Swiss-Prot record:
Keyword Disulfide bond part of the UniProt annotation: yes
Assembly behavior: Disulfide-bridge linked aggregates.
Record's signal peptide: 1-19
Family: Belongs to the gliadin/glutenin family.
Annotated region described as Disordered, given as residue ranges: 20-179
Name of this chain's protein: Glutenin, low molecular weight subunit
Additional free-text comment from the UniProt record: Glutenins are coded by several genes on each of the group 1 chromosomes of wheat.
Regions crossing the membrane: none
Classification via InterPro entries: Bifun_inhib/LTP/seed_sf, Bifunc_inhib/LTP/seed_store, Glia_glutenin
Purpose of the protein: Glutenins are high-molecular weight seed storage proteins of wheat endosperm. Thought to be responsible for the visco-elastic property of wheat dough.
UniProt keyword annotations, A-Z: Disulfide bond, Repeat, Seed storage protein, Signal, Storage protein
Taxonomic lineage of the native organism: Eukaryota, Viridiplantae, Streptophyta, Embryophyta, Tracheophyta
Length: 356
C-alpha cells in the first residue's frame, strides 16, 4: 500500500509537473513576444514583476516540499495550484501587461518622446534659429552705438580733464617735490659743524668777491679767509659723501634766510619811519579819518606774496649752490655727488654741477 501511495504521489507530481511545464512552454511566447518591449522600455519593473513569479514557479522542489504533506488531499492541491495559476498569470498579464501598454508605453511616448521634441528640439531651434538672439545682439550693437556716442564725448572730454588735471599735478605736486629738493632740511648739529663754511660763503657770496677772496687767500695764507677755508674743508671731509650736497644746500639756504630776515628788519624800520613821517605831516584835526589810510599804507608796505618770496628764495638758492659747488669741492679736494634739481635757473647762470 505504501509503495502504491508513493507511486501514486509520484504520478500526480509528474502529471502536475508536466502540466506546469506545458503551461510554462505556452506562456514564454507571450513573455518572449512581450518581454522585448518591456525589456527595451521598462526592463527594471518587468524584470522585477515577472522574473520573480517565474523563479517561484520554476522552483518546484521547495513548493513541492512545502505542499507534499497536503498531497494526500489532492483536491486542495488542484484548487490551490490551479487558481493561483489562473489568478496569478491571467491577472498579471491582464493587469500588468495591459496597463503598461496603456499607462507605461503611451505616456513614455507622450511624455518622454514628445516633450523632448518639444523641449529639446524646439527651444534650441527657437534659441539658435530664431532671431531674438540676433535681435538682442543687434539691439546690443544698436545700444553700443549710443554708448559709444555717449562714451566718446567723455573720451573727448577726458583729454581736457587730463589737461586740466595735469597742470594742477604739475603745479601742486612737482613744485613741492622740487621744493623738498631745493629747500633742504638738515639737523642743527650739521649746521653747527659746517658753520665755518657758512661764514666763508656769507663773506664771499658774490662770484667777483669770491674770486678776490681766493686770490687774497693765495696771497695771504694766514688771513681769516684762509683759516675759515681750512676749517670748512676739515668739517666737510668728515661728512659722508652722500649727504655733502644736501648739507651744502642747507648752509646756503640758512644764509638766504638770514639775508631775508635782515631785509625784513630793514623794511620794518623803513615802514616805521614812513608812518612817523606821515603822522607828522597830517593835521591832528582829521582824527579817525587818518587811521584808515595809515592801515592801507601798512598793508601795502607789508604785502609780499609768499609765492614770489619762495620763487626768489629758490632762484637765490640755485645760484649760490652753483657757485659753492664750483668752489668748495675743488678747494677742499672733496667728492660731491651729482644732485639734479627740477627748477629753472635764470639765464646767464650755468649750473655745472658734476661729480668732483
Amino acid at each position: 500500500m505504501k509503495t502504491f501511495l508513493v507511486f501514486a504521489l509520484l504520478a500526480l507530481a509528474a502529471a502536475s509537473a508536466v502540466a506546469q511545464i506545458s503551461q510554462q512552454q505556452q506562456a514564454p511566447p507571450f513573455s518572449q513576444q512581450q518581454q522585448p518591449p518591456f525589456s527595451q522600455q521598462q526592463q527594471p519593473p518587468f524584470s522585477q514583476q515577472q522574473q520573480s513569479p517565474f523563479s517561484q514557479q520554476q522552483q518546484q522542489p521547495p513548493f513541492a516540499q512545502q505542499q507534499q504533506p497536503p498531497f494526500s488531499q489532492q483536491p486542495p492541491i488542484s484548487q490551490q495550484q490551479q487558481p493561483p495559476f489562473s489568478q496569478q498569470q491571467q491577472p498579471q498579464f491582464s493587469q500588468q501587461q495591459q496597463p503598461p501598454y496603456s499607462q507605461q508605453q503611451q505616456p513614455p511616448y507622450s511624455q518622454q518622446q514628445q516633450p523632448p521634441f518639444s523641449q529639446q528640439q524646439q527651444p534650441p531651434f527657437s534659441q539658435q534659429q530664431q532671431q531674438p538672439p540676433f535681435t538682442q545682439q543687434q539691439q546690443q550693437q544698436q545700444q553700443q552705438q549710443p554708448f559709444t556716442q555717449q562714451q566718446q564725448p567723455p573720451f573727448s572730454q577726458q583729454p581736457p580733464i587730463s589737461q586740466q588735471q595735469q597742470p594742477p599735478f604739475l603745479q601742486q605736486q612737482r613744485p613741492p617735490f622740487s621744493r623738498q629738493q631745493q629747500i633742504p632740511v638738515i639737523h642743527p648739529s650739521v649746521l653747527q659743524q659746517l658753520n665755518p663754511c657758512k661764514v666763508f660763503l656769507q663773506q664771499q657770496c658774490i662770484p667777483v668777491a669770491m674770486q678776490r677772496c681766493l686770490a687774497r687767500s693765495q696771497m695771504l695764507q694766514q688771513s681769516i679767509c684762509h683759516v675759515m677755508q681750512q676749517q670748512c674743508c676739515q668739517q666737510l671731509r668728515q661728512i659722508p659723501e652722500q649727504s655733502r650736497h644736501e648739507s651744502i644746500r642747507a648752509i646756503i639756504y640758512s644764509i638766504i634766510l638770514q639775508q631775508q630776515q635782515q631785509q625784513q628788519q630793514q623794511q620794518q624800520q623803513q615802514q616805521g619811519q614812513s608812518i612817523i613821517q606821515y603822522q607828522q605831516q597830517q593835521p591832528q584835526q582829521l582824527g579817525q579819518c587818518v587811521s584808515q589810510p595809515l592801515q592801507q599804507l601798512q598793508q601795502q608796505l607789508g604785502q609780499q606774496p609768499q609765492q614770489q618770496q619762495l620763487a626768489h628764495q629758490i632762484a637765490q638758492l640755485e645760484v649760490m649752490t652753483s657757485i659753492a659747488l664750483r668752489t668748495l669741492p675743488t678747494m677742499c679736494n672733496v667728492n660731491v655727488p651729482l644732485y639734479e634739481t627740477t627748477t629753472s635757473v635764470p639765464l646767464g647762470v650755468g649750473i655745472g654741477v658734476g661729480v668732483y
